[in-house]
């Protein structure tokens, strides 16, 4: 990484004024900073983009990413409700590699040792850097300074705020869903990978330009009670196990 300009913040720590090409506001103290601007707005959706049947299914993750317009430099998000049993994130970046895409920013709500294969994608240029909690091998890789960009760790609420306040723009959100229907309604209450609520992915579903739901339990419409609304979803695909 290039040398960073550092300033002393209100907590007495030297911190950069720019992170991954964006201005960073040093901590000023409690109630000392008044944010300006407006919240981000999600794109307008239209029925023109979807089949009359409401069936948004595509054959696989690679097809979904291609349909979503994945290209170099985009931000791709995932959630961590499946924790150290998540098969989806690795599949996403394997597919991105097959598509020849480079310099992606991965924006997980958290990552775990199971995601260690993504180190290979940082080495081969598919992933530029990660902004999200990094546990295990990924955390070590970042801490030792191997990542081309700077790692950014946010609280769960801080991640949601960063998305809604436009600090982070998600180009493509990939949401692992234990149960979903072909329209994109989804929840985590049932299915082989049932995990409970999908709240960590809520902001992603609401603000991302494109939203892909990946499930191993595709059921008939309607999937109720849904937490991820199909109206916010562009593509649905399946894996043998998520």
Task: Describe each PLM feature range.
Residues 2-242:
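Conserved alpha/beta enzyme-core scaffold
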